[in-house]
Amino acid sequence: MRDVKDTLRALVRIGYDGRVFKTFRGPKAGERFANEVRVLRHLEAAGCPFVPRLLEADPEEPRIVTTNCGSRVEHLDEARRAELFSELEKYGVRHDDADKRNVTYRQSDGRFCLIDFEFATILPGFEKKPDGAAT
């Protein structure tokens, strides 16, 4: 595995098969893990095509495994960055860390993608009730 991020809050590695392994560390690791899992599941259910898909979630570690959304973007126009994060809100999520470091480029389909949802918020009106209906 190749380390791509090693900080006090997270260790992110890319496996030889391309999957992304993110282990949460530090303060409130369990809460950040639970939030990222919840947001990724919401985005998948909403059909958002430009975020990773959650493949595994282990609350004991706490660790998630996701699909790979490409490589980090080195240069990105400020207007385009803002547009990407704004587009996410159409799927009911505010990223809450709208920095360039959370933008990747997926060469397979030529698409910019967004990653790292541990601080994201599901917007009012998009929350699901236990029966699956939106509030």
Model regions and ranges:
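Beta-strand-connecting loop/turn residues
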Residues: 17-18, 62, 101, 110
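C-lobe/activation-segment region of protein kinase-like
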Residues: 76-80, 89-96, 101, 106-135
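Short acidic loop-to-beta-strand element that houses the catalytic metal-binding Asp/Glu
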Residues: 11-13, 54, 102-104
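Structural motif
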Residues: 15, 58-60, 106-108
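Hydrophobic core positions within the conserved protein kinase catalytic domain
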Residues: 40, 85-88, 92
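Short hydrophobic-acidic sequence motifs that mark active-site Asp/Glu residues
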Residues: 12-13, 18-22, 51, 65, ...
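Conserved structural core of kinase catalytic domains
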Residues: 25, 29-33, 41-84
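ATP-binding glycine-rich loop module of kinase domains
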Residues: 1-42
